[in-house]
Regions:
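Class I S-adenosyl-L-methionine-dependent methyltransferase catalytic core
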Residues: 1-160, 164
Length: 167
């Protein structure tokens, strides 16, 4: 699923020119993938101290320059003072605040012009009714919902809103 996601993103972004926020970063796999593709403006947020220590140590060993923050992801988003080109979030599948997170990202202006937020979730979560939603992709049991600033969505984008299962 990660490789397929990055194939999609590779067609939309110049990784070395974007600011990325990785929420619920866990052991940092998504952050390392962005760093390996040239992203230098990268923030990884996780609440677990062991995870943030691991990401910090790994980032230093790889000279990846990832800025690591130990914080609750939703609280971090609500207090963020900067905007991002790409926000990736992989909360636990049983997390109760997917809608709050998506709405906060859009309502608080955390996406730059042309920016996207991607939330990973289970089959049981449907975020397609939320403002800024424009696509859903499914890779096996892994689901990604894509969001952008509503003002960035064109009529063509809105007509393309879809749920897809790539083969």
């Amino acid at each position: 699923a990660k490789e397929s996601l990055f194939n999609v993103l590779n067609n939309r972004f110049d990784f070395d020119e974007i600011r990325v926020l990785d929420l619920f970063s866990g052991t940092g796999n998504i952050s390392y993938e962005f760093a390996s593709r040239g992203t230098v403006d990268l923030i990884a947020v996780d609440q677990n101290r062991n995870c943030t220590r691991f990401i910090t140590a790994t980032s230093e060993a790889l000279d990846a320059g990832i800025h690591v923050v130990q914080a609750d992801a939703l609280q971090y988003v609500r207090r963020a003072s900067t905007s991002f080109d790409l926000i990736f979030a992989d909360p636990p599948y049983d997390w109760d605040h997917y809608e709050d997170l998506a709405k906060s990202i859009i309502d608080l202006g955390l996406l730059r012009e042309g920016g996207e937020a991607i939330l990973e979730h289970s089959d049981q979560t449907d975020l397609s009714h939320l403002p800024g939603f424009f696509a859903h992709r499914r890779y096996g049991h892994v689901n990604f919902s894509f969001f952008s600033r509503p003002q960035d969505l064109t009529e063509e984008d809105l007509s393309l809103i879809h749920i897809s299962e790539p083969t």
